[in-house]
């Protein structure tokens, strides 16, 4: 009899067979599940602390998705030959898993929970992110932790006007959509996608299709819990202190109502801090008078936050103006300026209300492309977008350094939004880096990065297919009343039930991201929200087109210029030279960057047109073939008793025999030629060994004959 109580569930899902198992590996974790999808295997584990730390006032959930190089049969690079800091892909996948799980833990549950997913085996055609999300959901479900799941997930492609469930990487190449949706039996919780300018109804159809298809996975997790789940935790939320809630409401509500009539963010924030401080002080006075201990600040802070949410949500649902005085459909005032920075290749300052992005575009060569060593194999990225939000953007102090998960996620969303409208590498051979520096933030900075990014690219002369704009939306739902908010503020983001970001062109959507905190948002509500988002997007696109009608036709004088030439692939080694000596000398002496592809396409880039022309000429000379009958201006390299060695082209010499110098007999070659002398010669013979015979005499004879017949000699 086995020492393991192993439980296995299998199901067919789209074109793949999925296997879930628990009870054999990582038994000391609160929950552990192995997910196997056609040889892509992940181990998802969950550990929950039995009690919350004293004074804990937030839910400490961490999700770590870790790719092991052995899963693809590789040994890691680097000196230590072991996995190091998380890659950008691992960070993004960790966020993807975190987002649908977090809202399903009960309010007031502050025990530390850690979800760790290891990728153990990889089929290059099956991405590991969906198996990882299903595994994390299943591990939480079998652990017995208080979790309102399970969660299912699906990737949806759109190929030949048909939705495809969990496509392979090969299918994704021909898809106009890459959408990941996660949710429970009843509701969608998270959407992450990029698309090729698709209409809103196609995007929403993909969300609904994915949600329907994920029910198979949810059913399998339920069966796994039934046969292999641990007992549910006996956890109850701490009873609410109704007397304290009533007292805090009595003290703070009038002041909070007054604070939310202040339209300026900084002034409102100052007033709210004063209300929090005054409320705590008043409660301490009450406790002192009663001879009791004052309530801890974390509890009071949570009550005040709930009170703020109630006030703001109530005002909006009752049709009153929003925090900054707008109605639900109005976009904040927009100002646009391009060409902001004098020596960059392209720049734009995009300001929407109290959110501002300074976005810079830089053009580079093929050598500047990012090389990514992924599990599935190495590939190159010609378009990079980096998002930075320093603490001063919100008037705060804080750490400045390497990007945090949020910054990486926002950068990827902005990149997804723009990539569909970039020209192909054949149309525009440059590598492109866009950096968005958030200089002010009050909501929707990632969408400001999309708008500013598009404008900076156009300023740099990148021939974009269309203007791309992004807008952040919010939604508040109370019973059967709901309100969709256009262009949300930071405060509205925290207090709403759904926030979603839509980016796209006048033709359609290029990126959609949704995060839903409650279970009650129907397809019809999402339809209304997407229609209102389109209205907002079209307004912003109008402002952008007014400011910048299209891409600059001239590149910045500081951007590199490029020319391409085609050479015989067999000649590549001649251009590179032994140990790279020839190409190194070429780049240093001409001040150019030279990239050579395996098929013989040579790209020469430089800010100097003279340098490019010189490099082109030299490469053409190196790769040129010596042809019989051709005339060359050569240099005498060496004098011999029987003739001279003449250099015709780089690395290509020929013999000028003593009998081929002039018509008369030559007694001493030194009387006619000197080393270093320029001499015009004609190729009269080559052999299979590459030896070349030259003649100067032939040109003299041709000149004499031409003089007699009045026809010009061969040049």
Curated annotation (Swiss-Prot):
GO terms for biological process: mRNA catabolic process; RNA processing. Belongs to the polyribonucleotide nucleotidyltransferase family. Its EC number is 2.7.7.8. CDD domains: KH-I_PNPase, RNase_PH_PNPase_1, RNase_PH_PNPase_2, S1_PNPase. It comes from the Bacteria. One of its GO terms (molecular function) is 3'-5'-RNA exonuclease activity. It is an enzyme of class 2 (transferase). The keyword RNA-binding applies. It holds the Pfam family S1. GO terms for cellular component: cytosol. InterPro entries: ExoRNase_PH_dom1, ExoRNase_PH_dom2, ExoRNase_PH_dom2_sf, KH_dom, KH_dom_type_1, KH_dom_type_1_sf, NA-bd_OB-fold, PNPase. Its cofactor is Mg(2+). This is Polyribonucleotide nucleotidyltransferase. The gene is pnp. HAMAP family: PNPase. Mg(2+) binds at residues 493, 499. Involved in mRNA degradation. Catalyzes the phosphorolysis of single-stranded polyribonucleotides processively in the 3'- to 5'-direction. Residues 560-619 form the KH domain.
């Amino acid at each position: 009899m086995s020492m393991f109580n192993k439980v296995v569930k299998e199901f067919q899902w789209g074109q793949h067979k999925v296997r879930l198992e628990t009870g054999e590996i990582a038994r000391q974790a609160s929950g552990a599940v192995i997910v196997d999808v056609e040889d892509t295997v992940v181990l998802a584990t969950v550990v929950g602390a039995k009690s919350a730390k004293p004074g804990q006032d937030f839910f400490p959930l961490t999700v770590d998705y870790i790719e092991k190089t052995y899963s693809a049969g590789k040994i890691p690079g680097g000196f230590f030959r072991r996995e190091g800091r998380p890659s950008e892909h691992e960070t993004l996948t960790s966020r993807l898993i975190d987002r649908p799980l977090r809202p399903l833990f009960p309010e007031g549950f502050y025990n530390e929970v850690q979800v760790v997913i290891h990728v153990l085996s990889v089929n290059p055609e099956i991405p590991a992110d969906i198996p990882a999300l299903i595994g994390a959901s299943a591990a939480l479900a079998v652990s017995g932790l208080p979790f309102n799941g399970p969660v299912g997930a699906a990737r949806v492609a759109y190929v030949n006007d048909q939705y495809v469930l969990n496509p392979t990487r090969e299918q994704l190449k021909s898809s106009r959509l890459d959408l990941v949706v996660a949710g429970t039996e009843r509701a969608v919780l998270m959407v992450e996608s990029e698309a090729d300018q698709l209409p809103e109804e196609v995007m929403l159809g993909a969300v609904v299709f994915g949600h329907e298809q994920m029910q198979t996975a949810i059913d399998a997790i339920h069966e796994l819990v039934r046969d292999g789940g641990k007992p549910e935790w006996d956890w109850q939320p701490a009873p609410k202190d109704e007397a304290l809630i009533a007292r805090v409401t009595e003290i703070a509500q009038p002041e909070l109502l007054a604070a939310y009539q202040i339209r300026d963010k900084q002034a409102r924030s100052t007033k709210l801090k004063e209300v929090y401080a005054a409320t705590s002080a008043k409660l301490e006075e009450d406790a002192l008078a009663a001879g009791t201990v004052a309530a801890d600040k974390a509890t009071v802070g949570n009550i005040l936050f709930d009170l703020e949410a109630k006030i703001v949500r109530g005002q909006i649902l009752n049709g009153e103006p929003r925090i900054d005085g707008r109605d639900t459909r109005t976009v904040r005032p927009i100002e646009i300026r391009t060409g902001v920075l004098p020596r960059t290749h392209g720049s734009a300052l995009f300001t929407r209300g109290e959110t501002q992005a300074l976005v810079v575009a830089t053009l580079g060569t093929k050598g500047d492309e990012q090389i990514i060593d992924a599990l599935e194999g190495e590939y190159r990225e010609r378009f990079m977008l980096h998002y930075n939000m320093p603490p001063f953007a919100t008037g705060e102090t804080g750490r400045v350094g390497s990007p945090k998960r949020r910054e990486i996620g926002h950068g990827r969303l902005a990149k997804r939004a723009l990539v569909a409208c970039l020209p192909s590498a054949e149309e525009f051979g440059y590598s492109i880096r866009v950096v968005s520096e958030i200089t002010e933030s009050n909501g929707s900075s990632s969408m400001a990065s999309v708008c500013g990014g598009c404008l900076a690219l156009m300023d740099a002369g990148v021939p974009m297919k269309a203007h791309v704009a992004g807008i952040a939306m919010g939604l508040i739902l109370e019973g059967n009343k709901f309100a969709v908010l256009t262009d949300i503020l930071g405060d509205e983001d925290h207090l709403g039930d759904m926030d979603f970001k839509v980016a796209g062109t006048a033709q359609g959507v290029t990126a959609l991201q949704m995060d839903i905190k409650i279970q009650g948002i129907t397809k019809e509500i999402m339809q209304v929200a997407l229609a209102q988002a389109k209205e907002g997007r079209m307004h912003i696109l109008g402002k952008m087109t007014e400011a910048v009608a299209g891409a600059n036709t001239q590149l910045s004088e500081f951007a590199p210029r490029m020319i391409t030439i085609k050479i015989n692939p067999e000649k590549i080694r001649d251009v590179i030279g032994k140990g790279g000596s020839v190409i190194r000398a070429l780049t240093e002496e001409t001040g150019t960057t030279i990239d050579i592809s395996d098929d013989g396409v040579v790209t020469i880039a430089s800010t100097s047109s003279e340098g490019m022309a010189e490099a082109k000429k030299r490469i053409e000379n190196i790769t040129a073939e010596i042809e019989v009958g051709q005339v060359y201006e050569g240099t005498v390299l060496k004098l011999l008793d029987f003739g001279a060695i003449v250099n015709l082209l780089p690395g290509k010499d020929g013999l000028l025999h003593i009998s081929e110098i002039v018509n008369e007999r030559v007694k001493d070659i030194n009387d006619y030629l000197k080393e270093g002398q320029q001499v015009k010669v004609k190729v009269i013979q080559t052999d299979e060994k590459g030896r070349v015979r030259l003649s100067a005499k032939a040109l003299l004879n041709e000149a004499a004959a031409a003089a007699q017949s009045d026809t010009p000699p061969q040049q």
